[in-house]
A protein has these predicted regions:
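Flexible, acidic glycine-rich loops studded with aromatic residues
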Residues: 104-106
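Short, hydrophobic-biased segments on the C-terminal half of alpha helices
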Residues: 109-110
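A short, conserved structural fragment
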Residues: 113-123
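C-terminal scaffold of the Radical SAM
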Residues: 1-102
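Short, amphipathic alpha-helical interaction segments positioned at domain boundaries
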Residues: 130-144
């Protein structure tokens, strides 16, 4: 029904008319950087992921004291970035580049293609309509 109405699938859980994609979320799914300001907010910059204190009063008290309101952080290593690029990239209609897959992931992609869950595109892979319904399982296979 959405396709018939002129909408296109551009992300596992999102459809839009041409040009109407949510640029904010595309930044996340494409591995971009973002600021997180406020209680419970998350941020990502140059491979460093951090998150703020969740409780609004505790966050405000830290800010009032001139303290960093971060509750924690982690540096995303190369393997983590690779896995995230698979997980987030497969959510998108543009799919993933084949070079993010290791040998086991490449074999899993060929198997998923034979199962009708992935389709090859020049230099990479895209979920089929059936694959979108099984996206988490496909990602787990491709992680190797």
């Amino acid at each position: 029904a959405l396709r018939a109405a002129g909408f296109a699938w551009y992300e596992v859980s999102n459809w839009s008319k041409p040009g109407g994609q949510c640029q904010h979320n595309l930044g996340y799914w494409r591995g971009g950087d973002w600021l997180g300001i406020g209680p419970g907010a998350h941020a990502h910059r140059a491979g460093l992921r951090r998150w703020n204190i969740k409780h609004p009063a505790a966050w405000a008290a830290a800010v009032d004291r001139g303290q960093d309101p971060a509750a924690g952080s982690e540096q995303v290593d190369a393997e983590g970035r690779r896995r995230e690029s698979i997980m987030l990239g497969l959510r998108l209609a543009e799919g993933i580049d084949a070079d993010v897959l290791d040998d086991q992931g490449a074999a899993a992609a060929a198997y998923a293609q034979a199962q009708g869950l992935l389709v090859a595109r020049p230099g990479g892979w895209v979920l089929t309509d059936a694959g979108r319904l099984m996206a988490d399982a496909v990602v787990a296979q491709l992680w190797g």
